[in-house]
């Protein structure tokens, strides 16, 4: 049975489908003796090369997902030419496959990031087709008027695309911010464009001084996961995310992983401090 090259590599944990498609477009992938093209179909017997290194036609990688609480000051890419610390430096090692990020957060944004071993799942969770909600806590400087809120919910042209918040909730009382020139809001987006939250507020003349993602679809950042730490999603939670994007995945009862996840959660909970926004 054959399948598209980009899906073949994504399902084996080499990267998200979007990443693999970019590698193919850049000429970094060869199929047998020819430069690969997007849409090429492959079977287990074909020879695939990435950056002149032969790709092992390994079995499908088991699907795992971790929830990571990103601190400010870390870069969300796998490499950084300026030598800044990476989120990937804090992730647990894998025997097979690699961690693939479901989207990114910029260096000055903190909060929830999802990482998975399933490239196809990562691609679908990011894809605009599924319009998965992302919720953020955002602190802006200045007095926000009703007209600003209405404009942000109606839609703003940023570049050549319209963006908008699906919802905006005032959160000052909840977070007990005593500095009234700083206003906290919880906002919801149905997409993950670069700097979208900041750009929307800037369109109304407001600077964002703090930004924290608190949920991605049904996954909420647990209060026991402190900045720089992570926790595994259960098989039930993984299946829920996969169903959300119409993806059938094989889940095996990995007792070793379950025990490791339970130990990790007990360790994090024993520290006893909740994640707070300052």
Predicted regions and their residues:
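Basic, flexible Lys/Arg- and Gly-enriched helix-loop patches that mediate nucleic-acid binding at interfaces
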Residues: 1-278
């Amino acid at each position: 049975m054959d399948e598209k090259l980009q899906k073949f590599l994504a399902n084996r944990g080499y990267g998200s489908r979007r990443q693999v498609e970019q590698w193919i477009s850049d000429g970094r992938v060869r199929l047998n003796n020819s430069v690969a093209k997007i849409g090429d179909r492959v079977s287990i017997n074909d020879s695939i090369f990435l950056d002149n290194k032969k790709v092992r036609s390994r079995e499908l990688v088991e699907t795992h997902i971790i929830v990571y609480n990103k601190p400010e000051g870390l870069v969300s890419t796998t490499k950084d030419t300026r030598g800044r610390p990476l989120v990937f430096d804090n992730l647990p090692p894998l025997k097979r496959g690699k961690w693939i990020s479901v989207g990114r957060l910029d260096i000055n944004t903190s909060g929830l990031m999802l990482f998975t071993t399933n490239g196809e799942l990562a691609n679908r969770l990011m894809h605009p087709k599924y319009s998965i909600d992302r919720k953020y806590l955002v602190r802006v400087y200045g007095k926000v008027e009703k007209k600003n809120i209405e404009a942000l919910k109606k839609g703003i042209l940023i570049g050549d695309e319209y963006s908008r918040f699906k919802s905006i909730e005032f959160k000052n009382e909840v977070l007990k911010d005593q500095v009234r020139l700083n206003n906290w809001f919880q906002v919801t987006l149905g997409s993950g464009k670069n700097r979208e939250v900041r750009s929307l507020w800037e369109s109304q003349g407001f600077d964002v001084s703090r930004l924290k993602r608190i949920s991605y679809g049904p996954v909420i950042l647990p209060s026991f996961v402190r900045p720089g730490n992570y926790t595994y999603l259960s098989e039930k939670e993984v299946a829920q995310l996969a169903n959300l994007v119409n993806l059938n995945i094989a889940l095996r009862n990995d007792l070793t992983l379950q025990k490791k996840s339970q130990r990790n959660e007990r360790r994090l909970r024993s520290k006893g401090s909740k994640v707070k926004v300052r």
